[in-house]
């Protein structure tokens, strides 16, 4: 099938009607209509046609009966099924399509409203959008009001749909379980982006998200013999009823080739022609994002890569069957998976290709929308704010400069002024080694014109630096976008993002201060501190309280006498919960909510474990549920957690060996379940070794009958948003124990606190602000401070000291092969990293403090339960600052300069 037209013409009429009773033939449009265009078309449409169109206009359903009509219609016509073969999956698809119909009606109105009012828009570029399940989110967020009974329907669409499905013979819970998590992200970066698009829709910010439509997600994680095994995530196998395929929106994207200068163009600063060697098409898929209690529906546009020519008939007819589809395979690999393994050259090139493909398609879509308004280019920054979520979309800076200079023929400096006023960059790391870099050779091969532009950007930038600091010669090499010191010259993408943006923000107060004094201190010296701001991360309470923990949301609503749950829009209302910390009846209900959530989690773990109950259900209320669920990485220190578990297990065994009764052991080490979840990058050997160790420890501990269920260890495979919604509400304690000064913010800590779980953590990332907001008495802090880290690392390197005896005994036990009898040296790299290779993440320095803090946790949870419950309530009461609505308000005011459109 030939590709659809990629024309972005503004011409509306392609053929005049031959009769006054006919509607003129109109072109398919890629964007909304301006008011003058609507008026022009309106005059050409016959009155009879307009009247019929209005009469049969699709309307939103607002009653259970109307939903049932729409549902059955989709079952029988869209899905071609019937009453007799409509299973839960078909019910999910039909329900999703019915809900989507409502959202699309509001989506069209929202987009037309934005086009008509022409406000400044926000474009949020993120390589990840970890959206979770869409149906339940839509049921909570969507606005339904029955005009005949607005009070009864207001704020209760989920209850209405639940009842409607019950009448049709389906359980809402079973229907919701049919939806796979969208494979569009991995960790906190993608979940932050998802929370932000939710809040932007809720706040009425005119915004679109731009990402990629990964066919196989990042990967599905299986645990086989304790090892992580990556398999494709076939999340699209049954289709995706939420997306709208836009075959008419196809943007050609070029790679490789060479640069030509037209006559008169003598330098790289003049308009040049990039003659590409390979071209693919970016095809748009739209995903409606509903706001909460509003008819605003924003858009998430995802790009899929397709070839310009899918099939080479000449090669096929000549018997070259393999190469006849080679172009298709090369193109489709671009959006096959998130983060291709870059441990080898082809994977590295594919990653860069993926990033440019996404940036180019997104930027050209943004430019098309702007050009429609016919404003001068100087007004572009007044109409467009582009937020770079990490360094992955930094190529958009270079692409905009290329388009303005090469295609729009603007002067270089005029174009650069527009670029730097348009972009803002969010940094997500304080670790120098985590900053993204690309080899110059690879970059020039794939994107030759962009390399020229980067050289020019750097040249002008370094000129300005030299003028300001003529005597500081070393500053030029430290601050240069091009790194010269490595074996191969590298492009430092974070530096490019800073130079090309008008604002740079960190994501927690500590993080924002650290980047100004460490990795970006030279830029602060040049630009001054005002360019660098802080916007502490947040999470959407609609997803992480209402959807994840409906029983807690209901208790809060009843306690605050807030039947329409307005507190989900104004989280400051939660502070009223503080009045109930001495109310025994309320605390009893609060504890029951937690117990019910534990039962829900135990059911999930049983299901994941082939129907075997790992956790003893008899003592759930007296069992501390201790969670660490996040990406597996050495700096997040899952190894510290598992070493602590081993220490606890060995101490219990020693007590029994020395004649203590199980009751005496239980008094010293009360009941506890340690739960892990998270994925390692496929090529990250040490992280995968940590996963293996956790599972080996679980095998030994969980099958040791001598400790009688006092300690259990669980690794939940393939951790995702849906599993997080079950795990997080069940937590008593969660672990946020990164080495101080390494975690930018973290958002899982906020999710646990919002669900009444206490946290144990280092003084790092958003833990600092959580402690400030909810009170130091309600957080278990331990470990060294960030200002001590470099000195400790230096001492490890040049003045090594003996390990604490507690940690030494743990490492010796691991070295003995007790957890890996078939391969006693299995965990040698992990042990050696601490014993002999500098212990970069300071496990040995924090271990004893960590153990002592866990003793406090045991004491409070088991011996002072009423105090524990009070801390839990106060945590939720004071968590309001961490709503992503507050984040979006701060971005809007301090970075984007945009206002809500209501």
Swiss-Prot record:
Residues bearing the modification N6-(pyridoxal phosphate)lysine: 751
Positions where Phosphothreonine occurs in the chain: 31
Knockout consequences: Decreases cellular phosphatidylcholine levels. Growth on non-fermentable carbon sources is severely decreased (lactate or glycerol). Sensitive to sodium dodecyl sulfate, and sorbitol.
Activity: how regulated: Activated by phosphorylation of Thr-31.
Signal peptide annotation: none
Enzyme class per UniProt: transferase
GO molecular function: glycogen phosphorylase activity; pyridoxal phosphate binding
Reaction catalysis annotation: [(1->4)-alpha-D-glucosyl](n) + phosphate = [(1->4)-alpha-D-glucosyl](n-1) + alpha-D-glucose 1-phosphate
Major site of localization recorded for this protein: cytoplasm
SUPFAM superfamilies per the UniProt record, alphabetical: UDP-Glycosyltransferase/glycogen phosphorylase
Phosphoserine PTM sites in chain numbering: 333
Gene Ontology biological process terms, A to Z: glycogen catabolic process
Cofactor(s) the protein requires to work: pyridoxal 5'-phosphate
Location in or out of the cell: Cytoplasm, Cytosol
The protein's Enzyme Commission number: 2.4.1.1
Pfam families: Phosphorylase
Alphabetically ordered keywords of this record: Carbohydrate metabolism, Cytoplasm, Glycogen metabolism, Glycosyltransferase, Phosphoprotein, Pyridoxal phosphate, Transferase
Stated family: Belongs to the glycogen phosphorylase family.
PANTHER family listed in its UniProt record: GLYCOGEN PHOSPHORYLASE (PTHR11468), GLYCOGEN PHOSPHORYLASE, LIVER FORM (PTHR11468:SF3)
Function: Phosphorylase is an important allosteric enzyme in carbohydrate metabolism. Enzymes from different sources differ in their regulatory mechanisms and in their natural substrates. However, all known phosphorylases share catalytic and structural properties.
UniProt subunit comment: Homodimer.
Record-linked NCBIfam families: P_ylase
Protein name per UniProt: Glycogen phosphorylase
